[in-house]
Every structure is written in structure tokens, then in C-alpha cells.
Regions:
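Structured-RNA-binding interfaces characteristic of tRNA pseudouridine synthases
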Residues: 1-249
Length: 249
């Protein structure tokens, strides 16, 4: 039996998703929780490898219980896990899937959202969930950022928006949708695609902020993409503003 479980977590107190001995990770907590629920060691596989400090509102995992372990109806799994879960991690829903299903390789789309709060003073209630950018942007920042965002749509080689040192050979990805939203002091960049390179969304967010601040022009984006050079794009935004928002299969 294999379960597909949708989870949510705050990334501030985690060293990323992937298990690391001696460090608190999402996968490490899931291993502990699932072992308690099913009475034995489970195989837990994630849809992505989020970095330290990155959160998720809709992260998908598969759980494969041990042979001979406790059998739990899928709809009851979130409540069965609740007593063992920490406060910054929750099971949202669960269902059974075929043994051939893979939570990472069967993904059709992922939506990430990056949140930037532009203010000289931070908001303690948003600590660990936004990039606190201590500069007030120009009044024309939002239309400039939206104009730049259009250039990311479609299928492109996004090598310029990948962290240096990554060993990925195929750097072509497709962006299906992109929005730049503003509410009060909070700017949110929403990006939906078929997959993302290492730090890609954070570099896109940093680049859009540079456009909003006047350090880059909206029409610079096609040239940056074509260059395939990381140094041409903007800064890598910090991890705390990033959330995996939605995964579809």
C-alpha cells in the first residue's frame, strides 16, 4: 500500500526537507511520525527538496508502510498522525495511489510564491515567512515588475536563473503562469511551471525586485535569459520568503 499525503509546514525551524543526520529536517520528522503511526519504519518520499527556511502550504509525499504494519484508511491518516506531529508540520489530506506513482516524477505543475515586505521596520508576526526588504520601492515598481514578469512565460533555457555549482544538465523549463501581486507593504510573486532549477524562483524574485527598484529594466529580462549567465540576473532572494504553494498531478 502507498499513500499520497499532502502536508504543510513552516520552514523556519527546519534544515530543509531532505533527511540529514543530527539536524531537524521535514523528512526526518516525517520518518519519526510515520514510524509511530504504522508501528515500523516507513519509506517517505517527497515531491521536492526544499531548502532550509523554505515553507510549504501544499507539499506532497508518499508513505509506504512496512509489511505487516498497521493498516489505516487513507481518510483517517491525518487525524491518526496528529498526536505525533510537531506544531509546525501538519497532514492536510491522504489517499491511496498505485505502487508505480512517484510524488516527484509524476508532477505536472508546481506553484511557488515568494513574499517580499518592503518597509524600513520589520513585522515580527511575519518573521520567517517573508523577505524583509528595508527599502521603500518607487511608485512605478509594481507595473515595472509585472512588465518584466511577462518575459519569463513560456519554454526557455533558464541557466541564468540557476545557482552556480548545480550539476543539472537540462536547464530548460516551462513557465505557465506568473503574477506579481501587492497588498499593503507585501509584494507576492507567484510562479507556476513544470519544474524549477535550484534557487530558480528565488533568483527570479530577486531579479524582479531589482527591476522594481530601478536597477534593471523590464526589457533586460530576454537578454538575461539568452545570456545563460548567472551573473547577469539579480540577487538570490533569501529562503524565508519562499513557499511551495500548490502541486498538481
Amino acid at each position: 500500500m502507498k499513500y499520497l499525503v499532502r502536508i504543510a509546514y513552516l520552514g523556519e525551524q527546519f534544515y530543509g526537507f531532505q533527511y540529514q543526520p543530527g539536524r531537524r529536517t521535514v523528512q526526518g520528522e516525517l520518518n519519526r511520525v510515520c514510524e509511530s503511526v504504522f508501528g515500523g519504519v516507513c519509506r517517505v518520499t517527497g515531491c521536492s527538496r526544499t531548502d532550509r527556511g523554505v515553507s510549504a502550504r501544499d507539499f506532497c509525499i508518499t508513505v509506504e508502510p512496512p509489511a505487516g504494519g498497521v493498516r489505516i484508511p487513507a481518510k483517517r491518516l491525518p487525524l491518526a498522525a496528529l498526536p505525533y506531529l510537531p506544531r509546525d508540520l501538519v497532514f492536510l489530506s491522504a489517499k491511496t495511489v498505485p505502487d508505480s506513482f512517484h510524488p516527484r516524477y509524476d508532477v505536472k505543475t508546481k506553484e511557488y510564491r515568494y513574499s517580499i515586505r518592503c518597509s524600513p521596520t520589520p513585522d515580527p508576526f511575519l518573521s520567517g515567512q517573508v523577505w524583509e526588504y528595508p527599502v521603500t520601492l518607487p511608485k512605478n515598481a509594481l507595473p515595472r515588475m509585472r512588465a518584466a514578469a511577462v518575459h519569463f512565460l513560456g519554454k526557455h533555457d533558464f541557466a541564468a536563473f540557476m545557482a552556480q555549482g548545480s550539476d543539472v544538465k537540462d536547464t530548460t523549463r516551462t513557465i505557465f503562469g506568473m503574477k506579481v501581486l501587492k497588498k499593503g507593504k507585501l509584494i507576492t510573486v507567484s510562479v507556476t511551471g513544470d519544474g524549477f532549477l535550484y534557487n530558480m524562483v528565488r533568483i527570479i524574485a530577486g531579479t524582479l525586485l531589482d527591476v522594481g527598484a530601478g536597477k534593471l529594466e523590464p526589457d533586460d529580462i530576454p537578454q538575461i535569459i539568452a545570456s545563460k549567465e548567472r551573473k547577469r540576473a539579480g540577487v538570490t532572494a533569501p529562503p524565508e520568503g519562499l513557499s511551495l504553494w500548490k502541486v498538481t498531478y
